[in-house]
């Protein structure tokens, strides 16, 4: 009887010690105990693999085979509209992200909005669709950026602003100014000085015309520039003795055409802003409205769930 009690007590002690070991093995120091127990244990040798011995022909063939084919997708203009926080350093972070990917920004306009602490950033760049989409997502992951909208395939209204100072004395006087600037910035340019003297000796040069004839030419040039500017929707904002300043707000292609047309008069100075863009508001036709109504009815009432008959 006493022996059986001792045996049962021994089993209970062993069971409790095993349970204690199990509980200890799952504690936070189990990893430390494992490292202490296996500190002096010899580690098994690492497996060795014999690398194949290649020659130059095999290596070149493998490199050519593994090199991906260049993308044949054409590069096109992309318009990105970024909604960002109005705080210092946002512009540098966005432009740095694009520069890291090798993009050349064609146009960049940043301005405040009607909402406090919110700015709008319009970026125009050239690139492939996939690469630009990756850059757009990377910019959108920046902390001060709310969202980046891609207006590339959307119907948008584009506008740029240009101010140009145009000569009223004609192309000859403009060429005289260019040559004079060339001689003043390059020492010892004897050929340019000879060209200046040759142009000034011509009969049609403003310096050789009577004052009344020069006045008539200036008014004719001003009238032509004013009519051309009005046809493009711009206006003359300043007139001086030898030049005038015109202002025009239009889409980029129209501004480029205007500058090309006033180039013969002599563009002395030009300041052109970047492109601003806003999406057009879609207008639905009667057919699209009927299709939307049918779709709403089909979503509300599922014909397959109706009872037969």
UniProtKB/Swiss-Prot annotation:
Bilayer-spanning residue ranges: none
Domain of life: Eukaryota
Pathway the protein acts in: Amino-acid biosynthesis; L-isoleucine biosynthesis; L-isoleucine from 2-oxobutanoate: step 1/4; Amino-acid biosynthesis; L-valine biosynthesis; L-valine from pyruvate: step 1/4
ACT domain segment(s): 79-159
Record has Amino-acid biosynthesis as a keyword: yes
Annotated signal sequence range: none
Compartments where found: Mitochondrion
Gene Ontology BP terms: branched-chain amino acid biosynthetic process; isoleucine biosynthetic process; L-valine biosynthetic process
Transit peptide: 1-24
Functional note: Regulatory subunit of mitochondrial acetolactate synthase, which catalyzes the first of a series of common steps in the biosynthesis of the branched-chain amino acids. Stimulates activity of the acetolactate synthase catalytic subunit ILV2 seven- to tenfold and confers sensitivity to inhibition by valine and activation by ATP.
Miscellaneous: Present with 15800 molecules/cell in log phase SD medium.
Similarity remark: Belongs to the acetolactate synthase small subunit family.
NCBIfam families: acolac_sm (TIGR00119)
Quaternary state and interactors: The acetolactate synthase complex contains the catalytic regulatory subunit ILV2 and the regulatory small subunit ILV6.
Name under which the protein is recorded: Acetolactate synthase small subunit, mitochondrial
Taxonomic source organism: Saccharomyces cerevisiae (strain ATCC 204508 / S288c)
